């Protein structure tokens, strides 16, 4: 326990090295049941990202159909291009629901009495690693989604075509797979700039409101502690040297940023105010010490997807660091 506290307070000279082992943490017997549940969800995350990365959209077909409204062949070509894409978008959306449930199970484990969030993170490293993997996935998904306007365009065209055909009393086979209620929910999901982050934020707020006997600090302290551990691992040569690849370094930075953003959305006054338990200046400094091309996306995530950066309570110095 003392080791992790020393990590958090930077007393790092004379103690057995401790760090959150993002590469090798294995579940204890006490963690195994929840770990298995979360693992079953996370095993699909890479295929979701690969599928999203390969998503090219039906832009040319839609454009041709809109420019030639009386050409039935072009209308059919656009529709046949869009339908399989909508089925893929449904898969992404359904994964977000599974992720939401997974996060709530993790939060329950990592915040429950009698242990403090810090004690939980030290005792349950495999669950902390899964929490980190959820955040890592979330930032990667949202980065890819933000760079792909085809998703919104395809889905809008799909909704318009369905509505037009309803007026003409036509029922299309795809409505058996993506009915009106599902389409409405998907529409709200994809309308968000960062849909997976919004999902995690909602899941965390829902967890807090459902567990009224649990102080909100238990949840926000879990997040701020995770941020501190990531920051100290990144800025301490002894810890960095234990990462076996650049990929783990990037993973750690992405997780740190993901937790900051989540904290900023969940905490009543956010991550940037003076009373915040997150050392924002230190976190930004750590990012800026890396190769610019590797962290620009993460700095942009702090600039554009946090909630409280532009509040009056945010210091000018922090704002200037993110200019």
Curated annotation (Swiss-Prot):
Any GO CC annotation of this UniProt entry: membrane
GO biological process: one example: regulation of actin filament polymerization
Record's subcellular location: Membrane
Keywords from the UniProt entry: Lipoprotein, Membrane
Single GO MF annotation: small GTPase binding
Signal sequence annotation: none
Membrane topology term: Lipid-anchor
UniProt xrefs under InterPro entries: CYRI, CYRIA/CYRIB_Rac1-bd
A Pfam family reported for this protein in Swiss-Prot or TrEMBL: CYRIA-B_Rac1-bd
Function according to Swiss-Prot or TrEMBL: May negatively regulate RAC1 signaling and RAC1-driven cytoskeletal remodeling. May regulate chemotaxis, cell migration and epithelial polarization by controlling the polarity, plasticity, duration and extent of protrusions.
The family this protein is said to belong to: Belongs to the CYRI family.
Subunit structure, interactors included: Interacts with RAC1 (GTP-bound form preferentially).
Protein name: CYFIP-related Rac1 interactor A
Taxonomic classification: Eukaryota, Metazoa, Chordata, Craniata, Vertebrata
């Amino acid at each position: 326990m003392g080791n992790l506290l020393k990590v958090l307070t930077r007393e790092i000279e004379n103690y057995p090295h401790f760090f959150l082992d993002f590469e090798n943490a294995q579940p204890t017997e006490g963690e195994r049941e929840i770990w298995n549940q979360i693992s079953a969800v996370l095993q699909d995350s890479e295929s979701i990202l690969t599928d999203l990365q390969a998503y090219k959209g039906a832009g040319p077909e839609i454009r041709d159909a809109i420019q030639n409204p009386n050409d039935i062949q072009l209308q059919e070509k656009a529709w046949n291009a869009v339908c399989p894409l909508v089925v893929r978008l449904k898969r992404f959306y359904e994964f977000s629901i599974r992720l939401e449930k997974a996060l709530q199970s993790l939060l329950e484990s990592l915040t429950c009495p009698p242990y403090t969030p810090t004690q939980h993170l030290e005792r349950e490293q495999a669950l902390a690693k899964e929490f980190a993997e959820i955040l890592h996935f979330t930032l990667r998904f949202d980065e890819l989604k933000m760079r792909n306007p085809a998703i919104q365009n395809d889905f809008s065209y799909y909704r318009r075509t369905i509505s037009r055909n309803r007026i003409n009393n036509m029922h299309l086979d795809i409505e058996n797979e993506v009915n009106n209620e599902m389409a409405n929910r998907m529409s709200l999901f994809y309308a968000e700039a960062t849909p997976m982050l919004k999902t995690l934020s909602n899941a965390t707020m829902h967890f807090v409101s459902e567990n009224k006997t649990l102080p909100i600090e238990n949840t926000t302290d879990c997040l701020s502690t995770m941020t501190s551990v990531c920051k100290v691992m990144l800025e301490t040569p002894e810890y960095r040297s234990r990462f076996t690849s650049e990929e783990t370094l990037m993973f750690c930075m992405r997780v740190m940023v993901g937790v900051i953003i989540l904290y900023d959305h969940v905490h009543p006054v956010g991550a940037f105010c003076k009373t915040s338990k997150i050392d924002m200046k230190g976190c930004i400094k750590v990012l800026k010490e890396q190769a610019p091309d590797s962290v620009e996306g993460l700095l942009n995530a702090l600039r554009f997807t946090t909630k409280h950066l532009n509040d009056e309570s945010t210091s000018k110095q922090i704002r200037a660091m993110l200019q």
